[in-house]
């Protein structure tokens, strides 16, 4: 999970720079079991080093993310309609359900884009040709987990959230493209 956090932070910084270049207000918010930090809203590219410093403090935490607390805290901090971009993975059905409920409250006022990091190991496991009984079991478990993941994505989309699934090694380009697409729609 640690390399994925680093990839998400790098993608968030690329996105922040793109947002500053087009004149948007940009803030970083991070959380794990509780909110960790939120930067002020920055508007100019010369403010980018402040965002980099804040991002350098974001690290992997071996705890369950508390989406309910984090998203309600974030919602309370934002006083105008905003585009909220969440980099996430789905680890289990319970945390995914809590995330969906918290997102449901936010999506009423804000535009949400979920950047879901693909689990390529899980996809490989599902596609691997089984050579033993345990291989069949692993493939079936992987297939079930991938189905659950698609159900979570569908629920988020039904709420009105945008969702993109991206490979861990190409998050930046995909998220900037999605952000610019939302900007072109003019729906903020």
Regions found by a protein language model. Give the residues of each.
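Exposed, interaction-prone extracellular/peripheral surfaces
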Residues: 1-188
């Amino acid at each position: 999970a640690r390399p994925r956090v680093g990839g998400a932070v790098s993608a968030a910084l690329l996105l922040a720079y793109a947002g500053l270049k087009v004149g948007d207000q940009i803030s970083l918010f991070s959380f794990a079991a509780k909110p960790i930090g939120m930067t002020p809203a920055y508007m100019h590219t010369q403010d980018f080093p402040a965002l980099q410093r804040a991002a350098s403090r974001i690290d992997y935490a071996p705890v369950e993310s508390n989406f309910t607390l984090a998203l309600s805290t974030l919602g309370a901090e934002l006083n105008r309609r905003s585009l909220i971009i969440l980099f996430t993975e789905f680890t289990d059905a319970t945390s995914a359900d809590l995330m969906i409920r918290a997102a449901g409250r936010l999506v009423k006022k804000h535009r949400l884009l979920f950047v879901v990091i693909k689990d390529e190991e899980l996809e490989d496991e599902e596609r691997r040709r089984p050579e033993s009984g345990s291989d069949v079991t692993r493939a079936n478990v992987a297939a079930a987990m991938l189905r659950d993941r698609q159900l979570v994505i569908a629920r988020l989309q039904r709420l009105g959230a945008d969702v993109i699934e991206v490979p861990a090694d190409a998050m930046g380009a995909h998220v900037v493209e999605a952000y610019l697409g939302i900007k072109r729609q003019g729906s903020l």
